[in-house]
From Swiss-Prot:
Residue ranges occupied by any ABC transporter domain in the UniProt entry: 6-245
Transmembrane intervals: 282-302, 529-549, 596-616, 617-637
Entry similarity comment: Belongs to the ABC transporter superfamily. Macrolide exporter (TC 3.A.1.122) family.
Gene: pvdT
Protein name per Swiss-Prot or TrEMBL: Pyoverdine export ATP-binding/permease protein PvdT
Entry's Gene Ontology cellular component terms: plasma membrane
Species assigned in the record: Pseudomonas entomophila (strain L48)
Length: 654
């Protein structure tokens, strides 16, 4: 006689206790099952036979007692080893079929092999062969709702045999079938028993139980009879699989599975679920899409604005310093920078050019047109200092400056507003204040220098003419200074500071700034603005993440039975965790990609509306990464909840 494959000794199972009444379902069950046996466990509803099957199939653990499988104490096995047993040793056939609704017949049959790490080609071939053997060759692509009850039960039998099905646990396999389909299922079980499979049949129907070699009766959680027949000979080749199980258990051969195959299956299953629930998926995606699109667009607008302002400021030169007298306060009088100071600064070796500036808003007239423009008195270094060339005509000369000539160089918008678009104003006159000035040149378009000031609405006249004819003051409003080396602006600033302190009897009655510092300050301001815009947009991404978590929690609740089915077919906790985490991440990835596409389209529209937009690859990748991380973070809790479900409770959930 062969050694028992399954040994139960004084198995007890109780529920409740402490805060609720204790209910003992199994009371001291002891039995042995040998390789090749066909055993029927018979009992009325509530007798404990299904609980016994769950313990035999490693779906549940007994409260007390000993369960040895192939010589190993099952109590010593961890959750992964129990999953291995369910995957490699057992095959379940349930009364309610327990097929995954979103999968085809073939996909349902292949499930145990996926968790076993079987290569796809081998897996597909075996599933098709099993379905063909069970008369379902033409139904491989059908989903459960497209199959009859008998066909669904045959699919579940094929699934039980996918990894070998050494031990078939059939719980009321004919209970939901008509007599013809029930007879077909029992004939299949008879055939499997004759091939050496251990068949454990759970039923309340004694006529069905009579097909077994051995009948065990359970009543009120106790075994009341056992009509054990003679044990099958262990010499039969079909029974050698039991020895193989013992050897693999002894070696600790716990199959890890092929992570690539499992990941592909997880992705495919996730896509199926998303496609089946398209409307709900779209609503969930909306939060992620809006979040990602908002982040990308906001950062692009901020970056575009920053680049535009920086370009405009840099266009005036980064080697320029500005000098002006300090404003008077209640504590001390104001300072004045004189033309003599300007001349002294021009002698410094660090200074390339120096230019006094006097100016203000004045009424300008030409014909019937009149408007206020900024009029600045400058010297001939204006184009060089501000990198601002004349595109038509000429700039005024040193002779004009020396004589105080009433000549003017105008900006592009002064030209269009006072003379009309496309006109030639050269040689014509503008009445500035009450003084006529002849237009001798037109400056290149420059745009806004900072804020809302438009540099093209500017008129440049000789400093001498402005100070005498227009403003009545010889002292400059401020002084523009160009350093020889833009990399040594700070050194130039220090030299000017020392010179002026000496000239002003040690007083620091002047302010000296440089464009490089202004550009850096503006860059910091723009960066802060971009971060603020991104943070505001990120809130919508957070809301989208909460939506993902909400929908995943709902999904876990809806698919609790599916989780139980996967566990019964050998899925480990990490497999379930991976499955639902993959769904959450895929949801976020699809939302992220869609959000980026929409953001690019919105950005294109903003560009057409002449709004500065600059998409930065790091910002796009960062937004996508945030979407994925959102899926991981907000999908982890629902996935962990799914992985921690009790297999028995999951299978019996509605």
């Amino acid at each position: 006689m062969s050694a028992p494959l399954i040994e139960l000794c004084d198995i007890r199972k109780a529920y409740g206790g402490i805060d609720s009444p204790k209910v003992e379902v199994l009371r001291g069950i002891s039995l042995s099952i040998h390789p090749g046996e066909f055993v029927a466990i018979v009992g009325a509803s509530g007798s404990g036979k299904s609980t016994l099957m769950n313990i035999l199939g490693c779906l549940d653990r007994p409260t007390s007692g000993s369960y040895r499988f192939a010589g190993r104490d099952v109590a010593e096995l961890d959750s992964d080893e129990l999953a291995w047993l369910r995957r490699e040793a057992f095959g379940f056939v349930f009364q309610g079929y327990h097929l995954i609704p979103s999968g085809s017949a073939q996909e349902n049959v292949e499930m145990p092999a996926i968790y076993a790490g079987t290569p796809p080609a081998e897996r597909h071939a075996r599933a098709l062969a099993l379905l063909d053997r069970l008369g379902l060759a033409s139904r491989t692509g059908n989903r459960p709702h497209q199959l009859s009850g008998g066909q669904q039960q045959r699919v579940s039998i094929a699934r039980a045999l996918m990894n070998g099905g050494h031990i078939i646990l059939a719980d009321e396999p004919t209970g939901a079938l008509d007599s013809h389909s029930g007879a077909e299922v029992m004939a299949l079980l008879d055939e499997l028993a004759s091939q050496g499979h251990v068949i454990i049949l759970i039923t309340h129907d004694r006529e069905v139980a009579a097909r077994a070699q051995r009948i065990i009766e359970i009543r009120d959680g106790q075994m009341v009879s056992d009509s054990a027949a003679s044990q099958p000979s262990p010499a039969q080749p079909e029974q050698l699989q039991a020895n193989d199980l013992r050897q693999r258990l002894d070696r600790g051969a716990i199959l890890k599975g092929a992570w690539k195959g499992e990941m592909i299956e997880a992705l495919q299953a996730a896509w199926r679920v998303m496609w089946i629930n398209r409307f709900r998926t779209a609503l969930t995606l909306l939060g992620i899409i809006i979040g990602v699109a908002s982040v990308v667009v906001m950062l692009a607008v901020g970056e575009g604005s920053k680049r535009q302002v920086m370009a405009q400021m840099a266009a005036f030169g980064s080697n320029i310093l500005y000098l002006n007298g300090k404003r008077a306060t209640a504590q001390e009088p104001g300072g004045i920078v004189t033309l003599d100071d300007v001349a002294a600064i021009g002698e410094l070796p660090q200074v390339l050019h120096v230019m006094p500036v006097i100016g203000g808003q004045l009424m300008v007239r030409q014909g019937n047109s009149s408007q206020k423009f900024y009029v600045g008195g400058n010297n001939t270094w204006f184009p060089a200092i501000f990198n601002w060339p004349v595109v038509e005509g000429t700039f005024f000369s040193e002779a004009d400056e020396a004589s105080g000539a009433a000549v003017a160089v105008i900006g592009q918008k002064v030209r269009s507003k006072m003379f009309g678009e496309g006109s030639n104003p050269l040689g014509q006159y503008l009445l500035i204040g009450n003084v006529p000035f002849q237009v001798v040149g037109i400056l290149a378009a420059k745009g806004a220098s900072s804020g809302s000031e438009d540099s093209d609405e500017r008129i440049v006249v000789p400093y001498s003419a402005a100070s005498i004819r227009l403003f009545g003051s010889h002292d400059p409003e401020y002084v523009a200074i160009a350093a020889i080396d833009s990399r040594r602006v700070n050194e130039t600033e220090a030299a000017i500071d020392r010179l002026l302190r000496q000239r002003h009897q040690g007083k620091h009655d002047f302010d000296l700034t440089n464009d490089a510092a202004l550009i850096q300050a503006e860059a910091r301001t723009q960066n802060s603005l971009s971060l603020m815009l991104g943070a505001i947009a990120a809130i919508s991404l957070l809301v989208g993440g909460i939506g993902v978590m909400n929908i995943m929690l709902m999904t876990v609740r809806e698919r609790t039975r599916e989780i139980g089915i996967r566990m019964a077919t050998g899925a480990r906790q990490r497999d379930i965790l991976r499955q639902f985490l993959t769904e959450a991440v895929m949801l976020s990835m699809v939302g992220g990609v869609t959000g980026i596409v929409i953001a690019l389209l919105v950005g294109g529209g903003l560009l057409l509306a002449d709004i500065a937009v600059a998409f930065a690859l790091p910002a796009i990748l960062g937004a996508f990464a945030c979407a994925v991380i959102t899926g991981v973070v907000f999908g982890f809790m629902p996935a962990r909840k799914a992985a921690r479900l009790d297999p028995v409770k999951a299978l019996t959930s509605e």
